[in-house]
From Swiss-Prot:
GO biological process: regulation of translation; translation
Native source species: Mycoplasmoides gallisepticum (strain R(low / passage 15 / clone 2)) (Mycoplasma gallisepticum)
Keyword tRNA-binding: yes
Subunit structure of this chain's protein: Part of the 50S ribosomal subunit.
Sorted UniProt keywords: Repressor, Ribonucleoprotein, Ribosomal protein, RNA-binding, rRNA-binding, Translation regulation, tRNA-binding
Its job: Binds directly to 23S rRNA. The L1 stalk is quite mobile in the ribosome, and is involved in E site tRNA release.
Protein name: Large ribosomal subunit protein uL1
GO cellular component terms listed in the entry, alphabetical order: large ribosomal subunit
One Pfam family, short name: Ribosomal_L1
Family that this chain belongs to: Belongs to the universal ribosomal protein uL1 family.
Keyword Ribosomal protein belongs to the record: yes
Cross-referenced Gene3D superfamilies: 3.30.190.20, 3.40.50.790
Encoding gene, per UniProt annotation: rplA
Domain of life where this protein originates: Bacteria
GO MF, any single term: tRNA binding
Length: 226
């Protein structure tokens, strides 16, 4: 049985034309106005790509430092032999094999792991623990690096990871309901430009199929693709 729409959702859907494609700034304004949550909504972007994600070279993954930080504070675990540098850069937890053993024992009170390449052999053994939660460090996201301090600083300033899902979609929060619309536009364009630059050479035809923005639990608003 189809779920009945709430009055708020019906009102939100009735306030704009869901079939129309809007300029990015207008779409963001609509997304803000159609938010239906009692708490402050985030503004999210969804980019649908023409990718065959069964092929490794068409699985996009990486990280981006948006022009305007909209990330919640995160807990950073640094597994490194550069412990003084990691602490100075702002890591919440620092260690080596001791921290890996804590993870094996069930400790998961962190949001990102940044590590040196030398520790990836041991961390790789935790694939069944870290993989499903998206916590396995990866060179593509800058979380496997020799420059621990720089990586920690970037993530502390709001660096965000992105990756395609099974259907070739990329989702990211690019602002909050209270964020200035121009700042959200700049964040969204930064992500769109990066995704355009990452187009796999094997992709034929239209690469970006559609873009939409929405508030938390709000309706999607279609965006013009430039």
């Amino acid at each position: 049985m189809a779920k009945k729409l709430t009055k708020k959702t019906k009102a939100a859907l009735g306030s704009f034309d869901p079939k129309q494609i809007y300029d990015l700034d207008k779409a963001i304004e609509i997304a803000k106005k159609t938010a239906t949550t009692k708490f402050e909504s985030s503004i999210d972007i969804a980019i649908k790509l023409n990718l065959d994600t069964t092929k490794a070279d068409q699985q996009l993954r990486g990280a981006i430092s948006l022009p305007h930080n909209v990330s919640k504070p995160i807990r950073i675990l640094a597994i490194t032999d550069q412990q003084a540098e990691a602490k100075q850069a702002g890591a919440d937890f620092v260690g080596e094999i001791d921290k890996i053993n804590e993870i094996k024992a069930g400790w998961m009170d962190f949001d990102v792991i940044i590590t040196n390449p030398k520790f990836m052999i041991e961390l790789g053994k935790l694939g069944k623990i870290l993989g499903p939660k998206g916590l396995m460090p990866n060179p593509k996201t800058g979380t496997v690096t020799q420059d621990i301090a720089t990586a920690i600083t970037e993530y502390r300033k709001g660096k965000k990871e992105y990756r395609t899902d099974t259907f070739g979609n990329i989702h990211m929060t690019v602002g909050k309901q209270s964020t200035d619309t121009n700042k959200i536009v700049e964040n969204a364009n930064a992500l769109i430009d990066l995704i355009k630059s990452r187009r796999p050479s094997a992709v034929k035809g239209v690469y970006i199929q559609n873009i939409s923005v929405s508030s938390t639990m709000g309706p999607g608003v279609k965006v013009k693709i430039n």
